Regions:
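Hydrophobic transmembrane alpha-helices and immediately adjacent juxtamembrane helices
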Residues: 1-310
C-alpha cells in the first residue's frame, strides 16, 4: 500500500492511498463507509473549495455580504405582498404572526433554492478538476452546500433581530429549530448530490431544475399555511417533504407549539383540518435519510464515468 501525493487547482495538496482502500467494497454499508472515509480524508479540500466559492461570490461585490440576505428579503417581501393580496380578498387582516411565519419560512426556502440552483452545475463548471485530478467528486456539490449555509447563517442572524418585533419571544420550543434546519440540510444535500450527478450526464437537467425551483414555491407552504388549502389540499401540499419542515419551523418558533402533539383547527368554511402532526416530521426525516443515502450511492457509483462525460 503506497501513498501518492496529488495537487489540485484549489491549491490544496492531498494524498491518495493506493492499494486495498481502492478496491470496490461490496454492499451499501461498505460504499457508505468508503464515501465518509473519503470525505474525512479530503476535508481540507472541502473547506478550501467552500472558501473559494464564498470568496468568488463576494469578490468585488458592492453590497458585499449584503447579498447573503438579499434573496431571503426578496422572497419574504414577495410573501408579504401575496398574503396582503389574499387578505384583501378574504377580508381578514394579516397579523404579525403570519408575517413572522413567512419571514422564517422564506429564509429556509431561500437556502434550499440557492443551494440546489448553484450546486446542480458544480461538476460541469469544474470540468478541469473533474477530468484531471483525483479527489472524491462529492466535495464539489457539498462545497456549494456549505457556502450557501454560510449565507443562510447571515440571513438567520438578521432574522433573530427581526422576529421579536413580530411578536416572537423566547420559549422552550425554539429548540426544535436546529433539528428542523438539520433535516432541511440533509434533504438539500440529497438533492444537490443527485442533481449535480444527473446534470453531468443530461445537460438539460439544469433547465428543468430552474423551472421546478421557480414554480416550486407555489407548491410549498412558504407564503401560506397548508390549512388554507382545505382538508384535501393540505394533505397534498404536505406530500412535499420540505413542507412539514417549514411548517414545523412556523409552529414551533412562531406559535410556540410542541411538535410532539397533533393539532387540528376548524376553518372558516367549517372544515376540520389537521394543522400539525408529528407523522409529518417523521415523513420528512425518512425522506431526508433515505434520499441522502440513495443519492450518495448513485453519485459515488457514477464517479468512474464522470471524466469521460464532463
Amino acid at each position: 500500500m503506497t501513498g501518492t501525493a496529488v495537487s489540485n487547482e484549489a491549491g490544496v495538496a492531498t494524498t491518495r492511498t493506493v492499494g486495498d482502500a481502492d478496491m470496490p467494497t461490496a454492499g451499501i454499508v461498505g460504499s457508505l463507509r468508503e464515501i465518509l472515509s473519503d470525505l474525512v480524508r479530503y476535508r481540507e479540500l472541502l473547506m478550501e473549495l467552500t472558501r473559494r466559492d464564498i470568496t468568488i461570490r463576494y469578490k468585488q461585490a458592492v453590497m458585499g455580504f449584503g447579498w447573503a440576505i438579499f434573496m431571503p428579503i426578496l422572497i419574504v417581501l414577495s410573501g408579504f405582498l401575496v398574503r396582503f393580496a389574499m387578505s384583501q380578498m378574504s377580508g381578514r387582516p394579516v397579523g404579525a404572526e403570519q408575517l413572522a411565519g413567512i419571514a422564517l419560512k422564506g429564509v429556509a426556502w431561500s437556502f434550499f433554492v440557492g443551494t440546489v440552483s448553484f450546486a446542480t452545475t458544480t461538476l460541469t463548471s469544474n470540468s478541469n478538476l473533474v477530468s484531471k485530478v483525483y479527489f472524491p467528486r462529492e466535495v464539489l456539490p457539498l462545497s456549494a452546500l456549505l457556502a450557501q449555509t454560510f449565507d443562510t447563517t447571515i440571513g438567520l442572524t438578521a432574522l433573530v433581530f427581526v422576529l421579536p418585533f413580530l411578536g416572537v419571544t423566547l420559549h422552550p420550543n425554539l429548540l426544535w429549530a436546529p433539528l428542523l434546519l438539520a433535516l432541511l440540510f440533509l434533504i438539500t444535500a440529497a438533492a444537490t448530490l443527485f442533481l449535480s450527478c444527473a446534470n453531468l450526464f443530461f445537460r438539460d437537467v439544469k433547465y428543468i431544475v430552474q423551472v421546478l425551483l421557480t414554480f416550486g414555491i407555489f407548491f410549498t407552504p412558504v407564503f401560506y399555511e397548508p390549512a388554507m388549502m382545505g382538508p384535501i389540499g393540505s394533505k397534498l401540499v404536505l406530500l412535499n417533504p420540505i413542507a412539514p419542515i417549514l411548517e414545523g419551523l412556523r409552529m414551533s418558533v412562531v406559535e410556540n407549539h410542541n411538535l410532539i402533539t397533533p393539532l387540528a383547527r376548524t376553518t372558516a368554511a367549517g372544515h376540520s383540518v389537521i394543522v400539525w402532526t408529528p407523522l409529518g416530521l417523521l415523513y420528512s426525516a425518512t425522506v431526508a435519510t433515505l434520499g441522502l443515502i440513495a443519492s450518495a450511492l448513485i453519485f459515488h457509483r457514477s464517479e468512474s464515468a464522470f471524466a469521460e462525460n464532463v
